[in-house]
Amino acid sequence: MKRIAILLILALASCDDDERADLQGGGPGSSDPNNIVAGDGFCGPQGGSSALGQASWSSGVTTAKIDTDGNPAGQGLDPKWQADTTGHVNGQAVNSAQYAYVVMSQRQMDTSGVSMGDWATVTNTATGQTTFARVEDRGPDGGTGEISQAAATGVGIEFLPNSFTVGDPSVVVNAYAGTASIDGDCPSQLTET
């Protein structure tokens, strides 16, 4: 019975939804792809890892959980989906499918000095793949390992439209206090207007 349910979920996930296609891509971030500035977090920080210094907070090895908030295509698929995110890019919610971000609780931010917009890294412990991200959403106390769809994709973690991961992937999330002002090093990825 479980196999049938999984096959049905996979079949539904692969269906083409032309009505919602405009919500599923088209550029970095949840906002107008022509209004992006370096530093929005679409790539790594200028100066790379060395610019960030030592991590102020680490999740330790934890099970990856996918946050679909900010991605309009997640509505009705993820039971915990929310249209808005705590952080914003160009005045709009941060789209989980297009922007690598991590989720931290207010308590985790308070004890570590990390703020919205600070840089983070996500590492897939099985493969060693690491991606840069920003802290862009607030979650419940005690939560760890919650990452955006884009961050999961960046480290090779597969997931279903309802936010369930394929398998039981583990990640380490590190966040770096006081790094929000470090611009992204991504001018080649920006769209000129």
Language model features: what each stretch is:
Residues Q24-M116, A126, R138-E146, G156-T193:
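Secreted/periplasmic proteins
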Residues T123, G128-F132:
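Short, mixed charged/polar active-site loops
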Residues D16-D18:
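Bacterial signal peptide processing site
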Residues K2-L7:
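Sec-dependent signal peptide recognition
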